[in-house]
Amino acid sequence: VEWTDFERATINDIFSKLEYEVVGPATLARCLVVYPWTQRYFGNFGNLYNAAAIAENPMVSKHGITILHGLDRAVKNMDDIKNTYAELSVLHSEKLHVDPDNFQLLADCLTIVVAARFGNTFTGEVQAAFQKFLSVVVSSLGRQYH
């Protein structure tokens, strides 16, 4: 993947401003509410009965933060995201048996949460860079499935 200077700067800027303790939990909670079938991967998380329970669930919050910190690895290795996520792809494919389509659903939820947090500064150009980055991450996480 070729990255422009603008794309690199944009991705670094977004992640430097993210409030991980807010955005991570909000992203995973949104995914679990909007796409309830994704809840099957989190059976050990306890009460996921409704949107309020999901939003207040400490395990959802913790894992949402973990996911964002996982994206830090891609930010730091933008020129080699596929290899950066090779082990994580194997884990999600062979041990956790996660449907790879769910990575895109989570990426879409992250885009919505980030757009809401950034407001007018999340322009079309910024969104294009962010979604390009997330599409490379999603592809890398799904690599083991191919």
From Swiss-Prot:
Heme b binds at residues 63, 92. Keywords: Heme, Iron, Metal-binding, Oxygen transport, Transport. Red blood cells. GO terms for biological process: hydrogen peroxide catabolic process. The keyword Transport applies. Coiled coil: none annotated. GO terms for molecular function: haptoglobin binding; heme binding; metal ion binding; organic acid binding; oxygen binding; oxygen carrier activity; peroxidase activity. GO terms for cellular component: blood microparticle; haptoglobin-hemoglobin complex; hemoglobin complex. Residues 2-146 form the Globin domain. PROSITE patterns: GLOBIN. The keyword Heme applies. It comes from the Eukaryota. This fish has two hemoglobins: Hb1 (major) and Hb2 (about 15-20% of the total). They display the Root effect and the alkaline Bohr effect, which is enhanced by organophosphate and to a lesser extent by chloride. Belongs to the globin family. Hb 2 is a heterotetramer of two alpha-2 and two beta-2 chains. Involved in oxygen transport from gills to the various peripheral tissues. This is Hemoglobin subunit beta-2. It comes from Gobionotothen gibberifrons.
